[in-house]
């Protein structure tokens, strides 16, 4: 890239250098339908920065639960873990690697919906914002990405 195209690239293309995630938990966060008390417990959430998503797409819940970093090793750039308590939240603000093209969020629920895969969520790098956190709701043993607010047009 020459100097002019570098400046244009910086102006017209968003450059995400920090991964901003807000994890918001509902009161019914991590429950088990066979537990009659309906006790909601804290949830371990793993956040993976990946070069590619092939190893993640091929992985099942059990393998990520037991050996996530090893299963994802061929694509893994970085990983973090957070504990999210029911009816509370957690924030993650960490450098986003230049090599990371995807961010995978994996919640280790007691009773995950492995059929629909709602225990994991994948964001492409272009889904991230440089100055705004992506909000992910945790509840009823599922992850849900909250849509970004619509930006007003300047014209």
Language model features by range: what are they?
Residues 1-16:
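Bacterial Sec signal peptide processing site at the extreme N-terminus
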Residues 100-111:
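A short, solvent-exposed beta-strand micro-motif common in secreted/extracellular proteins
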Residues 21-36, 52:
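Short amphipathic, basic-aromatic surface patches that mediate peripheral association
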Residues 62-78:
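Short beta-strand and strand-turn-strand segments in soluble, beta-rich domains
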Residues 87-96:
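Exposed aromatic-hydrophobic patches
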Residues 20-24, 44-48, 104-106:
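Soluble periplasmic/extracytoplasmic beta-strand elements of cell-envelope proteins
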Residues 35-46:
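Short coil-to-beta strand junction motifs in C2/discoidin
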